[in-house]
Amino acid sequence: MFWFDPSNQRVLFGDIRDEEHMLCDGRVLNIKPDVQMDFRDIPFDDGSFRLVVFDPPHLRRAGHVSWLRAKYGILSDDWQEDLRRGFSECFRVLGHEGILIFKWNEVQIKVSEILALTPHEPLFGHKSGKRADTHWICFMKRVDGAKEA
């Protein structure tokens, strides 16, 4: 995962998975969330957080034993609705003017298709990775709770 210090008390790592995988080079991939949860139904009250990082699976296709599937997970056949609900839940648990950092790799699905799933407009973003396929996108929840047009 991308946390500098996963033991930092200000960080809460949530994932639907709780598993361990042996990779082909002998390394172990541990997915051990602080809270095992589904991003479509986040088990926290409205306004609980000032900052949320939303890093959902971005793959629709991956081999059953591939390390990409093990590391990043895979989207369901209902991925548009899943991500729509995920965005909604992230904004629900954010406080007023809370920040949402969204990470997406568009190797299989374009970021424009994903951004169409939320009424909230991003403030800014950054492309990274070897082919600039990974997008880091920043949103801020509006104070009045209104949704952008």
Residues covered by each model-derived region:
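Class I S-adenosyl-L-methionine-dependent methyltransferase catalytic core
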Residues: 1-149
